[in-house]
From Swiss-Prot:
Organism the protein comes from: Azorhizobium caulinodans (strain ATCC 43989 / DSM 5975 / JCM 20966 / LMG 6465 / NBRC 14845 / NCIMB 13405 / ORS 571)
Residue span of region Disordered: 85-121
Superkingdom of this protein's organism: Bacteria
Protein name: Small ribosomal subunit protein bS16
SUPFAM superfamilies: Ribosomal protein S16 (SSF54565)
Keyword terms, alphabetized: Ribonucleoprotein, Ribosomal protein
Pfam families according to UniProt: Ribosomal_S16 (PF00886)
Cellular component terms (Gene Ontology): cytoplasm; small ribosomal subunit
Gene designation per UniProt: rpsP
Biased composition annotated in UniProt, kind: Low complexity: 111-121
Family label: Belongs to the bacterial ribosomal protein bS16 family.
InterPro entries from the UniProt entry: Ribosomal_bS16 (IPR000307), Ribosomal_bS16_CS (IPR020592), Ribosomal_bS16_dom_sf (IPR023803)
Gene Ontology biological process terms from the UniProt entry: translation
Keyword Ribosomal protein: yes
An example molecular function term from Gene Ontology annotations: structural constituent of ribosome
Length: 121
């Protein structure tokens, strides 16, 4: 049985509220869970103390048992000092794709030809 520490959505439409739960990876997002270990209210200010509540003892116990946190929960655990999360770094994220680079090269070549033709006149 693969265990996940993840968010289960609650609250009304357009008013999300999440429970931080330990659940079997095969169970539905908002379905059956083993234990609730905290809450997350994204509507509160980022510096509000009640935004994320987490029972660190339970979280530590489940991590020792092999439960894998999702990305968002890993951020919460990192902020609580329970887990060291590697910062993601994707230097190629802002670069355009191959075809866009080819089109830009074509445009630059045409602009260079046009400037040469204009200077030749």
């Amino acid at each position: 049985m693969s265990l996940k520490i993840r968010l289960a959505r609650g609250g009304a439409k357009k008013r999300p509220y999440y429970r931080i739960v330990v659940a079997d990876a095969r169970s539905p997002r908002d379905g059956r869970f083993i234990e609730k270990i905290g809450t997350f209210n994204p509507l509160l200010a980022k510096d509000a103390a009640e935004r994320v509540t987490l029972d660190t003892e339970k979280a530590k116990a489940w991590l020792e048992k092999g439960a894998q946190p999702t990305d968002r929960v890993a951020r919460f655990l990192d902020a609580a000092g329970l887990l060291k999360r590697e910062a993601r770094n994707n230097p190629k994220k802002a670069e355009p794709g191959k075809k866009a680079q080819e089109r830009a090269a074509e445009r630059a070549a045409k602009a260079a030809e046009a400037s040469e033709a204009a200077s030749a006149e």
